[in-house]
Amino acid sequence: MKEYRVYLERARSRQQDFLYPLIFREYIYGLAYSHNFNRSIFVENGGYDNKYSLLNVKRLITRMYQQNHLIISANDSNKNPFWGYNKNFYSQIISEGFAIVVEIPFFLQLSSSLEEAEIIKSYKNVRSIHSIFPFLEDKFTYLNYVSDIRIPYPIHLEILVQILRYWVKDVPFFHLLRLFLYDFCNWNCFIPSKKSISTFSKSNPRLFLFLYNFYVCEYESIFLFLRNKSSHLRLKSFSVFFERIFFYAKREHLVEVFSKDFSYTLPFFKDPNIHYVRYQGKCILASKNVPFLMNKWKHYFIYLWQCFFDVWSQPRTININQLSEHSFQLLGYFSNVRLNRSVVRSQMLQNTFLIEIVSKKLDIIVPIIPLIRSLAKAKFCNVLGHPISKPVWADSSDFDIIERFLRICRNLSHYYNGSSKKKSLYRIKYILRLSCIKTLACKHKSTVRAFLKRSGSEELLEEFFTEEEEILSLIFPRDSFTLHRFHRNRIWYLDIIFSNDLVNDE
């Protein structure tokens, strides 16, 4: 982001902190191209890198300079000359430019707040999503109730733009942003359809993720305000994420908003043992206290979304359950708190007592049905879990086919290695193994049995089941008892920051 700072300082010297002129600068789109070129190989870019050229950028900027081309026809936006014949391509370029420009001031604010707090090093530790699981193991065993909440979606994009205007004071920039969103999403109705939102998010991932994350950050900042008001304990771990939007400077305004929007005064309560975890569009609220207090938090969330963000949320979509009797889905796992009962014999003098001890343990299970559904969607098996061949990969070499299957199996094995029960994982690996064999047999136009007998590939395909043991043998001594003990325990790969589509099935 150093080049971001340089370009923003250059723009500040010309225009007084306005973002609007940056949209017409070629280097902004060069930064967007660099971001697309350097991102993960697992993410498809939809041909953006192949079609990008400086000539196309100059042509797009020229079109935007011609103000008569910015007039939108509400009846038929597809004929708008602003986009010409390459509407999808130009919209993708300009959305990347919008994302780069709007991220600059927020990144600079976040960097300054992190430097002042001297927590740059600790901030890097929160990159891994797998840090959630050790947190669950440490905290959730002491809690009793959990509420599985899905954040309301979709939200009207006009509300997102209005929320963003609170923090960036540049009216021309937001007029152009609103014009772009209006033209692409076709805002002829009050609420855009899920199909239009989905299309917008897939072709413009960076801008969509920024707007959506900003909406989530705004709602979580208000939730943090309620949480701090309801308890004497401050959430130190949350302060890093909310200082970037200057939340504490907005506290007095929030009090006025709540007093106007809510029909009654919010009766705050003391609940120091509440924990909040969010990933993607879901969040989990867990507490040690009685369900009455959890119901209060449930209504706070509903009224917050309805009054502050104009998003309708049904009370029945938020369920409150006991952790010992309910499994909640998070990060591709099914998790619950299992009660382990044991009886201890105690003797005092000549009297003998039987004492029943109940201990809690976080039970994390591999969800077999969602994984089979994902494998069926990727054409590795049918909906019943029966392996099928992958004819699309038949043009590759035998080594490449086996390596592709092994890579998927390796990712799944690493991701779900922390589960307490691995039988479901072994079944998934078995499906991938047979699918690989059938793909190779299909390529060589043979049956599975004849192919294995002729090529002797059975030993090679044993890597699907022996690879994890070989990895552990590099870390721990090659001792059968040691490996067996570690296979029974959980090993979290905390350096994994990317999960493929097969494990991201929520």
Swiss-Prot record:
GO terms for molecular function: RNA binding. It is found in: Plastid, Chloroplast. Its main location: plastid. Keywords: Chloroplast, mRNA processing, Plastid, RNA-binding, tRNA processing. GO terms for cellular component: chloroplast. It comes from the Eukaryota. Pfam families: Intron_maturas2, MatK_N. One of its GO terms (biological process) is RNA splicing. Belongs to the intron maturase 2 family. MatK subfamily. Usually encoded in the trnK tRNA gene intron. Probably assists in splicing its own and other chloroplast group II introns. PANTHER family: MATURASE K. This is Maturase K. The lineage of its organism: Eukaryota, Viridiplantae, Streptophyta, Embryophyta, Tracheophyta. The gene is matK.
